[in-house]
Amino acid sequence: MTLSPLQVLLYKYIMSTFLSNLFARKKLLWPGMTDVHTHLLPGVDDGFSSEKDSLAMLAFLEGQGVERIFLTPHIMADLAKNRKDYLRDRFETFREDCAHIHIDLHLAAEYMLDECFYERMEEGLLSYDGKHVLVEVSCLQAPGDLFEKLYDIQLNGFVPVFAHPERY
């Protein structure tokens, strides 16, 4: 079977369009996004345990258009090592290892409103912008002084932001 010049032209057009769409850069999933709650700081809580896995996730997120990420490790009585200075040191070391990834990384924290919270607040809170603080409570039972703690957070110049509101 011989193709006419018009059929050849149409075939070439269809194939070139198909191939260019097949190999074209896909649309970004989250262009310009800021993620305000992650557990990407390796080895400090229930997030990634290895730096390799954290770096792989950051590379994936970069490829999807994410531009800024707040690393928000848990700070709670059950994780005594997770103090502000310790987390800052871990973050700075990790950020140096992320130099090849073009995402603006920041450190904040996810604070459990437990018996150690007031002590943590006296040390200074790791917040998003000097104003917003990520907090959580047990999904089994809120502390009896929940409203007092939320009020005290505000008296200290912060706006509490609940992590996982769907749990409550």
Regions found by a protein language model. Give the residues of each.
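Extended substrate/RNA-proximal surfaces in nucleic-acid metabolism proteins
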Residues: 82-168
